[in-house]
Design a protein with these regions (language model features):
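Catalytic loop of the DD-peptidase/beta-lactamase superfamily, centered on the K-T-G motif
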Residues: 2-52, 57-59, 92, 200, ...
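Active-site helix/loop module of the DD-peptidase/beta-lactamase fold
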Residues: 102, 106, 111-115, 119, ...
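Internal, well-ordered domain-core segments that constitute the primary functional module
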Residues: 171, 204-214
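Intrinsically disordered, low-complexity terminal tails and inter-domain linkers enriched
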Residues: 51-102, 266, 335-342
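Tryptophan-centric aromatic hotspots in well-structured domains and transmembrane helices
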Residues: 12, 46, 103-104, 118, ...
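Short active-site loop at a secondary-structure junction
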Residues: 21-34, 53-60, 95-159, 196-206, ...
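Generic structural signal for alpha-helix termini and adjacent loop/cap motifs
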Residues: 130, 162, 191, 329-333, ...
């Protein structure tokens, strides 16, 4: 029996029950779930193991000591000690006192794969909100080299809605090239679109990193990871990084597979395309296979070099607390936020509307199921079931999920190191979302 730790506010007990059940029913390894409602934290749960295989943390070295966050402080003011670290870890911080796997604690962070896209998407929307970026402008206005190979008419909004026609690379990058900051932008700038930009959509699984990252660098003069740190993470007090500092490596949970990850899958009985995403992935010529294989071989996500890279498609590292707080801040003020901007609220009403107004819908040329995107965010639907019609956010391949629902006034995040085969509706995340829905309905009855 896994010892689930943390707190839930009255009425949210179903979330705790669902979280505990995930370990028994779905083979959960280590995970956390956090829910904010009306700017206040009402669920904060964690359990399982940080190093499921009993191995070392991603850095293979010593623990990170005082574990300071992006603000330079050791921990969030509202955090309560989850366990006595001296009892649960040995001197190098890798294993429990009994020599077994290290337990997941309240400050454990995790690589969240494509959940990163939802954090990264806030950057161009905030730049637009501040008058620095025209969403209806051409990408080549800011990045002249990008107009090559028939891409001169690609708009910024096409990029955010997965409509550029560049979800693949004719010549995949090596893991080293993917993180060098030069090869990726150069490759997508030279790539010929596989459909007429703006006429269709398909999930830019890997190329989103270099498309969005380079656009932000051209507009701001800063890397996207630095922009997120300076404009979002520090003001809001988030333990969230795109480009993990070396001193934070000891906090990161080690990824372990719950089931084979040989091919992506879209979970759920409602997803019945003529050709499944798993079948498409097995075809080496399919857009599905080529999109996910834009980096070949796939990088080791436990590798320190990967953790340190700024890959806005997949490389973010965060706690569940940080992601839930981030989404809560997109839609409403946070009383404890350390920023004067709108009491901690990030999106103005008009920006929030743009984030969740449908830009792309229907058959996805990569995922081969029907998907819905706003500007940078997946929207509620069969491929990405969230809380309700107004929800927006992003799942990550393998299970993690984070989103906001303005009508319910919530920010939700679930992170896991037990990677299941899947791109969209992971059964563990969906069990938690259903429990949130049940809890909210009971409170309003």
């Amino acid at each position: 029996m896994v010892d689930v730790q943390g707190t839930v506010a009255d009425g949210f007990e179903p979330v705790r029950d669902a979280f505990a059940a995930n370990f028994a029913r779905h083979g959960e390894r280590g995970a956390a779930v956090v829910l904010y409602r009306e700017g206040e934290k009402v669920v904060d749960l964690w359990g399982g193991t940080k190093t499921p295989d009993g191995g070392q943390d991603p850095d293979g070295g010593e623990d990170s000591g005082d574990r300071k966050g992006p603000t330079g402080r050791a921990d969030s003011d509202d955090r309560k000690a989850s366990t006595d670290r001296a009892d649960s870890e040995d001197s190098d911080g890798h294993e429990g006192s009994d020599g077994g796997p290290e337990p997941w604690t309240q400050d454990t962070a995790q690589v969240v794969r494509s959940v990163t896209k939802g954090v990264a998407a806030a950057v161009p929307l905030l730049l637009h909100q501040r008058g620095q970026l025209d969403l209806d402008g051409r990408v080549s206005t800011y990045w002249p080299e990008f107009k090559a190979a028939g891409k001169e008419r690609v708009l910024v909004r096409h990029l955010l809605a997965h409509r550029t026609g560049v979800p693949v690379l004719d010549t995949p990058l090596t893991p080293a090239e993917a993180v060098d900051g030069i090869s990726g932008p150069r490759a997508v700038a030279a790539q010929q679109p596989v459909w007429e930009p703006g006429t269709a959509h398909g999930y830019h699984a890997q190329t989103y990193s270099w498309l969005l990252g380079e656009l932000v660098r051209r507009v701001t003069g800063r890397t996207i990871g630095r922009w997120i740190a300076e404009e979002i993470a520090r003001p809001l007090g988030l333990d969230l990084w795109l480009g993990l500092p070396e001193e934070q490596r000891g906090r990161v949970g080690r990824i372990a597979t719950v089931e084979a990850l040989s091919a992506p899958a879209a979970h759920g009985p409602r997803l019945r395309p003529k050709r499944s995403v798993a079948e498409a992935y097995r075809d080496p010529e399919s857009l599905t296979r080529r999109a996910f294989a834009a980096i070949t071989p796939l990088p080791d996500e436990n590798d320190p070099a990967y953790l340190a890279a700024e890959l806005p498609a997949s490389g973010g590292v965060a706690t569940a607390e940080a992601l839930a707080r981030f989404y809560a801040a997109l839609i409403g003020p946070l009383p404890s936020a350390r920023t004067a901007r709108s009491g901690g609220r990030l999106f103005a009403p008009a920006t929030l509307t743009m984030a969740r107004t449908e830009e792309s819908a229907g058959p996805d040329q990569v995922l081969v199921v029907g998907t819905r995107f706003g500007l940078g965010y997946m929207l509620h639907g069969p491929a990405c079931p969230l809380l309700g019609p107004g929800s927006f956010g992003h799942p990550g391949r393998g299970g993690s999920l984070a989103f906001a629902d303005p009508e319910a006034r919530i920010g939700f995040a679930y992170v896991t190191n037990g990677m299941r085969r899947g791109v969209t509706a992971d059964p563990r995340a969906q069990a938690l979302v259903r429990a949130v829905r049940t809890s909210l309905a009971a409170r309003e009855a």
